[in-house]
Amino acid sequence: MRRLLIVLTLVLSACAGGPSDQQALCGPSGRLRVGLVGSEEGQRGSAGVILAEQEQFKLRELLMASSRCDVLLEPVLSPEQARLRLRNSEWDLAFLPPGLTAVALEQEGQFSLVRQLGRRQNSRSQLIVRADSRFKTRADLRGTRLGLLPRGSLTGFYLPLFNLHGLTLSQVGYELTYQDLMQGLQNGEFDAIAWDGALPTQGNEIRVIHEDTHAIPLGALALSQPLLAQDYKPFVQKLDDNVSQLPSSLGYATGVIPDLLMLQELRAIVSKVEGWSLPQAGQPYVVYGAPSPSMPGEGPL
């Protein structure tokens, strides 16, 4: 009943002002297709727990009331699947973590960022090994088995590869979460894995052999060009006004535009790595490509 009252209040307030008020904000399909990846990378166990079912229902209700359009909510755990949907313009708006935010900016102006998502956690992209490993530096990882998050992750894919340029790896494997990568490292499936420095580790059981210097930006709510070509600001304002009804795990920041300056450098790295030949699961891989000498950060060995 409480959720119904919230939706009715939003709809009635939207209708009360007359014909000059907000029009329906819909995508080209006549609906609003919403990508839900969340604000964090590699920390969910299945697509169903990006948000609990009740939270998804509540989010959809708020988006419908705010847009006056039918909403199709599409939770996606895999950053690779989300990257493909962004590239194919399958979403009208999306709640994205940092890596996919950078990917969205690469889509030839198809998306713009309108609100910041997430909470500052001092994330850093790391490469870690078991404490008893003989590997001490990045260069020691030649011929090893590396565990990554899927393509689309900033801390778990793009930055680790950028920092391993020039190495030949015996095998690259993928997991959907950092927890699964850690399990693979402990079980001997991987010799080294990508890791987010903001996450707790297994104490003395692991060792960091490299940490990237780039600060990791937060995620973003991205809107597609067809929405941006319409009067989208009342929709965003309604989200701002009802932020308490949004799932807290999204970290929606009322009135806060994402930090584009911080994103630009990482966007360049994403673009650079996307131009390389990329690793196939279970196959040997030569980290291929030539990062620009003028690009700040760690880069080649």
Residues covered by each model-derived region:
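C-terminal motif of bacterial Sec signal peptides marking the signal peptidase cleavage site
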Residues: 12-14
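Short helix-initiation/N-cap motifs at beta->coil->alpha
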Residues: 73-84, 171-183, 215-216
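A local structural motif
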Residues: 64-75, 164-176, 206, 280-289, ...
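A ligand-binding cleft/hinge motif common to bilobed small-molecule-binding domains
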Residues: 95-108, 183-216
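Acidic, polar ligand-binding/catalytic clefts
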Residues: 76-77, 81-140
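Periplasmic-binding protein-like
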Residues: 27-42, 117-129, 203-276, 280-283, ...
